[in-house]
Amino acid sequence: MYFVYILKCKDGSLYTGITTNVERRFKEHKDGKGGAYTRAKKAIKIIYSEQYKNRSKASKREAEIKKLRRAEKYALIKH
């Protein structure tokens, strides 16, 4: 299984990523072992995730979410 996830960062920004284990990946982000963005912005909370059976579908969804504006991401999270 693959997951698309959104993290909230200390400065209020949002980070979208893909993984097979959301909790492990969040810990990596918090420990400074994630992407450069979360090392700089400090991930503080998992605020959303979606599950997919394969990497291809998850990657497509990740790309869709990354194109959304901030308000659209928050609307997605609320549903």
PLM segments and residue spans:
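GIY-YIG nuclease catalytic motif and its immediate N-terminal context
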Residues: 1-52, 56-66, 70-79
